[in-house]
C-alpha cells in the first residue's frame, strides 16, 4: 500500500487518521476532537475541518459531540500508515539516533512500499514489539498489529 496513491489523503490528513487509530488502540473508544487536537498539537477547529473531509471521503465516521471512529477502510489505511511510521522509527533507532514521530511519519508517508518493507527487514525488528501502549496494554499491541478487534 502506497499512501500517496490513496485518493483524497494528503500527508497532513494521514496524520489525523493515525492519531484517531492510535487513540482508539490506547483507549478502545471513539476519539474526541479535543483528544485529537492534543495529540497533534493543533487547534480543535482544525481538527473539525479535517474530520469533515475524512468523513466525506469515507475514512471515518465523525458525529459531533460523540467523537470519531474509523471505518473499516480507514482502519486498514491508518494501520498501514502507523506501521510505516513505526518501521522508519525502528530503523533510525537501530542506527543509534532518533528523528521523532513527526519526522518518521513524514518519511514513512513518502517512501514507496518496497522501501518501507526493505527498512523493516533491515531493522530486524518486529515493529509491533515497539507498541507505545505499554506492557500492561498488550491487547492494544495486538490491535495495532491487526490481530485484535477492528
Each model region followed by its residue ranges:
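Terminal disorder- and signal-encoded targeting elements
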Residues: 1-4, 150
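C-terminal regulatory/oligomerization modules of transcriptional regulators
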Residues: 105-150
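Short, hydrophobic-biased segments on the C-terminal half of alpha helices
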Residues: 51-52
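A short, conserved structural fragment
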Residues: 55-65
Amino acid at each position: 500500500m502506497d499512501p500517496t496513491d490513496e485518493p483524497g489523503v494528503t500527508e497532513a490528513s494521514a496524520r489525523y487518521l493515525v492519531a484517531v487509530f492510535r487513540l482508539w488502540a490506547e483507549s478502545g473508544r471513539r476519539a474526541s476532537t479535543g483528544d485529537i487536537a492534543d495529540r497533534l498539537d493543533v487547534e480543535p477547529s482544525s481538527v473539525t475541518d479535517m474530520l469533515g473531509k475524512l468523513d466525506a471521503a469515507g475514512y471515518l465516521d465523525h458525529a459531533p459531540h460523540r467523537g470519531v471512529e474509523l471505518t473499516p477502510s480507514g482502519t486498514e489505511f491508518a494501520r498501514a500508515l502507523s506501521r510505516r511510521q513505526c518501521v522508519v522509527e525502528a530503523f533510525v533507532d537501530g542506527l543509534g539516533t532518533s528523528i521523532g514521530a513527526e519526522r518518521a511519519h513524514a518519511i514513512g508517508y513518502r517512501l514507496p512500499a518496497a522501501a518501507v518493507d526493505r527498512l523493516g527487514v533491515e531493522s530486524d525488528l518486529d515493529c509491533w514489539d515497539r507498541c507505545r501502549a505499554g506492557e500492561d496494554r498488550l491487547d492494544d499491541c495486538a490491535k495495532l498489529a491487526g490481530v485484535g478487534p477492528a
